[in-house]
Curated annotation (Swiss-Prot):
Superkingdom per UniProt: Bacteria
Physiological role: Negative regulator of replication initiation, which contributes to regulation of DNA replication and ensures that replication initiation occurs exactly once per chromosome per cell cycle. Binds to pairs of hemimethylated GATC sequences in the oriC region, thus preventing assembly of replication proteins and re-initiation at newly replicated origins. Repression is relieved when the region becomes fully methylated.
Keyword hit for Cytoplasm: yes
Gene3D superfamilies: Met repressor-like, Replication modulator SeqA, C-terminal DNA-binding domain
Family the entry assigns: Belongs to the SeqA family.
Name of the protein in question: Negative modulator of initiation of replication
Cited InterPro entries: Arc_rbn_hlx_hlx, Ribbon_hlx_hlx, SeqA, SeqA_DNA-bd_C, SeqA_DNA-bd_C_sf, SeqA_N
Source organism: Actinobacillus succinogenes (strain ATCC 55618 / DSM 22257 / CCUG 43843 / 130Z)
Lineage: Bacteria, Pseudomonadati, Pseudomonadota, Gammaproteobacteria, Pasteurellales
Amino acid sequence: MKIIEVDEELYQFIASHTQSIGESASDILRRLLNLPTSSVSSVALETVAVESAEAANPETPSAVKNDFVLEPVAEKSSLEKTVKKQPEQVICHIVNKVRQVIESEAFQHETKAVVRFLAILTALYRTNPEGFSLAIESEQVQGRTRVYFARDEATLLAAGTHTKPKQIPDTPYWVITNNNSGRKMIMLEGVMHGMQLPDELIEDIRGYFIVN
């Protein structure tokens, strides 16, 4: 394992260019430097120290220096799992239910990103439990070196006592909540893509978590 220390400005710069959960440090830097994709195993970028400022207010970036761990990870298999295509009526049902949630008066007046985050996750699970379960267990959502969802609090606490796990209401799942609004949106996007939901819905939800 290799450890590097970066200052806050560099941390925020790298984090702002993350395009998916579990994206490797090599992937990010190669994209920023316009280098060709490497054919060798990459290393995953993982935060190992959650700063006191972010722990106190997870909706905003911290203002202290950050540490990253670079851990070697195995190359992805060239054989991707076959994803069962969801019937159109199932997708439409999920979209309608999620829109009911985000267009509700309670959601519109909610100011805490974590409450909105949990409300959307609950809606996704209740409309399609099987699809939700498959989506959150995928590498795209869980990442290569960090667990974001689990069936119990202990599993998430084992990954770090700072993760602030919360149970997703009316579901058997728990999720970490110590991240900022942008990271919450990346997690939601991964789940919704895994459930084969349309980009239009994802973009509408993005507006509640990321201000351009």
